[in-house]
Amino acid sequence: MWHPAKKHHYPNGLTLIVDEAPELKSVSIGAWVKTGSRHESQDFWGVSHFLEHMIFKGGKKRGALDISKAVDRVGGDFNAFTSREHTCFHFYLPALELKLGVALLKEILFHPLFATKEIERERQVILQEIAMTRESPEEDTFDRFMEKIFGKHPMGRNILGDKDSILGLNRKKVFEFFNQHYRPENMVIAVSGNVSFEKAKRELFVLGKSPWPNRKAGLRAVPQWGMDPPGPTLPGFWWINETSEQAHVIYAVNAPVKSHKDRVISTILQQYLGGGMSSVLFDEIREKKGWAYTVYANAIQFLDASVFSIYAGVKAERVLDTLKVFHSELAKLTRTGIPRQDLKRIQDSLIYSFELSTENAESRMMTISTSELFFKRDISSREYAKGVRAIKTIDTQALAKLWVQGGHPSILVLSAKPKGRAEWERVKEFSSRITGTDLELEAF
């Protein structure tokens, strides 16, 4: 049984959440910064992800190799990731090595060096990462899609930055952003595993007792840049003309979620439409028709905006047919909701998956962190199961109807333009009828 996590606020504003799991032999420590790419001005675009690369380069006492050796010695692991709203770096260690994890956190948070030579080295690594992403059609399609639907809002920019923005970052900018955002009052430390709340609170006190070095009082922790709600996503049909064997197709609707219940329903709808090999769209488009290798749905949820998207990599000549299936299946949900038998199957799957995740300290840490960052609270496995079981067919119908009737969908296709005039005219007619906008053709 997963009991709710316990929370503590330190004098300097740092928040600690602890999930006690005495049955485990490990501990996961995650440091979450409430800052991501949406909080970057144009001059700092890409700096959050840049810091993800720099954070484990070490400090005054331990360099990058020292950190790696310390973690390897105990058979542990460490990693980091950046999203549009958060940055996380985390350690996975034997439960007896909690003190090591805290010492490493202190080193990288209190005394980072961000040496110029390391910045130059990681700059080249990130430029290669950007190039690699552009060469991955699926990732590139999603980046272009986010840019289209969020317009000029920072949420629409990709997380990595571009060549010009990365070349424009320097040590001064990296430190400025770090000191302004990597502050105790703007962070959450999540600990999950074989550790008591009192022990975790005692060990982490070194991070919570006083202001951190170079974080001067009165310096605003989080500027308002990027914090204005992005608003409803922009409808449209964008066709990016790119010669390839496969077409990449995204169909999405603005999908407001106003409560935890809505998030659960959204996840259920995602599972039903494109959550795996038993999903409706996977069965229809891949298994029955053989049009695609990859097809899935994705509930993209932020603090103040949500998008429900469906993606497929299909044969170029099947783009319009695929879009019609996407539109038809989503429209069908507005009339009938998810059939009771399918709903029961998905509810079982979600509950069992949740229970299986409790056997891993890192999964548990991610779960309690997400709950804290989005809802300021944690839920037990019993409460989660109860919430999932409470969803009825009529609930899925109501949310699907809210999404579909709330505005026109957004569509992006990365593919060669159809050669036949008649086929292109059919695509244009579909755009006008479904999205309420004219089809926009762009060069790759």
Where are these regions (language model features)?
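Active-/binding-site microenvironments in catalytic and ligand-binding cores
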Residues: 25-27, 81, 195, 228
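Active/ligand-binding-proximal structured segments within catalytic/core domains
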Residues: 13, 20-71, 145, 182, ...
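A generic "binding-loop/recognition-motif" signal
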Residues: 14, 196, 277
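Charge-rich, well-structured scaffold segments of protease-associated domains
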Residues: 4, 9, 20, 64-216, ...
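His/Glu-based metal-binding/catalytic segments typifying zinc-dependent metallopeptidases
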Residues: 21, 30-32, 218-280, 387, ...
